[in-house]
Structure formats: C-alpha cells, structure tokens
C-alpha cells in the first residue's frame, strides 16, 4: 500500500499529561489469529482492550503471524510500503485450523493505551493483502 503520516503537535500520556520529548508515530500492521468460539458458535474477535491479555490483539496467544510497518515516523509524501507476515516465536501455522485476519491502521501507535498526539493524521491508500 501507500501512506503518508503527520504526527500531531503535542503528545499526551494516558493521564492526559504532556510528554514534551515524545513525538507520535503511526502503526500499520496485520495479524493472523486462530479461531476461538463463544458459547453461540461465533468467533471471539480480538480487540484493542489491553487490559484483557487474551482478547488484546497485541498479546493474545491466538495470534500466530504478524506483518508490520517498520517505521511509523513522519512521512510527508506518499510512500509505498510492504510488510511480510512472519510467524511469531514458538508458533506454527496449522492448515487444518480456521484463522482470521485483522488489519490495523492507527494514527497513534499507542492509541490503544490512550496515549498519543491529537491531530495526528494517517492516510492509507491501495492497501492490499496478498497470499503466496
């Protein structure tokens, strides 16, 4: 895909305090995660709730592969990016299991922790996921 990113002018921590030496960064990533069903037979989706380790997309043991933009700093002009999926440590892909794909594009990389710079702007275009 292609992206451009402008961080907001003032970074705040999760206590709404200014962090003067910190500049916001964006985050673009995708994860492949194993299906887990609730009592009604529906997949339990991963979320941004970092307080629930198993439901949180960043820590869930169900995530087996991840692809991510390496540098989330300011990019003024449209820039092409690619990211390859890599198996996480001690994980394997089992073709007999069902998996789900989640794609996250965030203007504040730590926004799920309620930290970032208001006004940060991430624009993504022509995002594609391809398989081999």
PLM feature spans:
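Extracellular carbohydrate recognition
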Residues: 75-77, 93-98, 108-131
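Hydrophobic residues positioned within well-ordered beta-strands of beta-sheet architectures
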Residues: 28, 81, 101, 124-125
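Extracellular carbohydrate recognition and processing domains
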Residues: 37-95, 117
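Extracellular beta-strand-rich recognition modules
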Residues: 1-3, 7, 97-107
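Outer-membrane beta-barrel architecture
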Residues: 23-27, 96-101
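Short, well-structured beta-strand
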Residues: 33-36, 89, 99-102, 110
């Amino acid at each position: 895909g292609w992206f451009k990113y402008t961080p907001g002018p003032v970074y705040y921590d999760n206590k709404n305090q200014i962090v003067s030496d910190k500049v916001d960064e964006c985050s673009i990533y995708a994860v492949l995660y194993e299906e887990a069903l609730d009592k009604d037979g529906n997949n339990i989706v991963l979320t941004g709730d970092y307080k629930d380790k198993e439901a949180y997309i960043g820590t869930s043991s169900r995530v087996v592969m991840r692809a991510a933009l390496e540098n989330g700093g300011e990019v003024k002009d449209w820039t092409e990016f690619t990211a390859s999926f890599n198996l996480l440590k001690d994980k394997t892909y089992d073709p007999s299991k069902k998996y789900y794909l989640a794609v996250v594009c965030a203007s504040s990389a730590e926004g799920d922790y309620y930290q970032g710079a208001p006004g940060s702007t991430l624009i993504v275009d022509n995002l594609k996921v391809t398989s081999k």
